[in-house]
Amino acid sequence: FLGVPSCDEFGNANGYSGKACCGSLGYAMVDADNAKQVVMLTEELLPYPHNPASIEQDQVDLIVKVDRVGDAAKIGAGATRMTTNPRELLIARSAADVIVNSGYFKEGFSMQTGTGGASLAVTRFLEDKMRSRDIRADFALGGITATMVDLHEKGLIRKLLDVQSFDSHAAQSLARNPNHIEISANQYANWGSKGAAVDRLDVVVLSALEIDTQFNVNVLTGSDGVLRGASGGHCDTAIASALSIIVAPLVRGRIPTLVDNVLTCITPGSSVDILVTDHGIAVNPARPEL
C-alpha cells in the first residue's frame, strides 16, 4: 500500500504533484518494484498519462481513491526538524569546523547529513565557510532538507540526490529544480546494486542515541532496549563515506550518550571516524591522519 498525492487511472505517480506533497518516493519505488501486489492510495486522480512518474503504470495493480492520504504538514517534525536548541547548534558549529579542517572540504566535495537536530544544522554553518573559500559541493545526498535546497538554489550545491524529502521545502523543490534528483533506495545505498550513491560520498554527519569507547553507534534503541527511532542509511553511509562524523551530546537528561558498550550496535566503530560532542571532539585512533 503506497500513499501518493495524486496519480492517473493506471497508477503513474510522483510525490510532488498534488495537495499532499510529500517529495521523494525513494523507498516506495523499491517496494513497488518488488511487491507481488501494489495498491496505490491517492486523494486525487489526474488525466492519463501523468508525468513524470516515480512509480509507473506497469508496477501498479490497484488504485484506491481516499478522502485524505495523509497530513503533509507533519513532514519535518520530530527527528527531521531544524533545531533551535543552543547545545545542538554548538555541536553543529563544531562539526562544521571539523569538516573544514578535515582535508575533504574542497571544490567538488559531496556531503550528507542524517536526522537529528545537530546533524541537520551542520549545513547552515557550512554556507559562510563555502563562500569565504569559494568552494561548491558537487552533490548532497540522502534525506534532503530546506537548508540543502537553499544552498542548491544559491549555487553552492550543484545537485541534490534525494531518497527522502525531510521537510515541505525539500518536497516542493523536487517539482521546480531540475537538478534536485529523485533516487530510489536501491540507487542510494544498496550494496547489491550495480551502483550505490553512498560510494561517491566524501563527508557524512550522523547522530547517535549511544556511542561507546570503541566508537560503535546505537541509533535505534534507548538505554532500556526499547525502539526509539530508525537507522535509515546510518551504517551504509558511515562505511562508504571518506569521512564519517557522529554528533551527539555527552548526556541527555540524566542518561549518558557515551557508554562503555552500546546496547544495540547499528554502526560498528570501524566505520566511524570522529565524534563531536558539546564537550569536545574525539578522533578514532584508527584514523591518525585526521
Stretches with model-predicted labels:
Residues 114-120:
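Core structural elements
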Residues 142:
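Active-site histidine-anchored catalytic micro-motif
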